Amino acid sequence: MFQAHLLRGTLTLSFFLHQADFDEAAEEVKKLKTRPTDEELKELYGFYKQATVGDINIECPGMLDLKGKAKWEAWNLKKGISKEDAMNAYISKAKTMVEKYGI
């Protein structure tokens, strides 16, 4: 019983530490000195939405909503990726962008 409780506590602590890294990465991306490419931003957006919401749960915007459609497609490409894996990918991509563009 004690081991199971300890394991749950460790997993919970691990999740919160990981969530803190994710939140920090999201804040750092907002401070980039140079704007990343549209492709980089779309990929980052897709990972962010997958990490925070999960699989896409909205209809694709109409043809005339180009920005909305691009964001929908970026998120839809991440469909099926676990929230944890999406969070890891977001953190990794954000670190790469901070190294590339500076904050």
Curated annotation (Swiss-Prot):
Gene3D superfamilies for the chain: 1.20.80.10
Endoplasmic reticulum recorded as keyword: yes
Single GO BP term: fatty acid metabolic process
GO molecular function, one term: fatty-acyl-CoA binding
Record Pfam families: ACBP (PF00887)
Superkingdom of the organism of origin: Eukaryota
Subcellular location: Endoplasmic reticulum; Golgi apparatus
Annotated GO CC locations: endoplasmic reticulum; Golgi apparatus
Domain annotation ACB: ranges: 18-103
Database matches in PROSITE patterns: ACB_1 (PS00880), ACB_2 (PS51228)
Known role: Binds medium- and long-chain acyl-CoA esters with very high affinity and may function as an intracellular carrier of acyl-CoA esters. It is also able to displace diazepam from the benzodiazepine (BZD) recognition site located on the GABA type A receptor. It is therefore possible that this protein also acts as a neuropeptide to modulate the action of the GABA receptor.
Protein name: Acyl-CoA-binding protein
Source organism of this protein record: Anas platyrhynchos
Name of the encoding gene: DBI
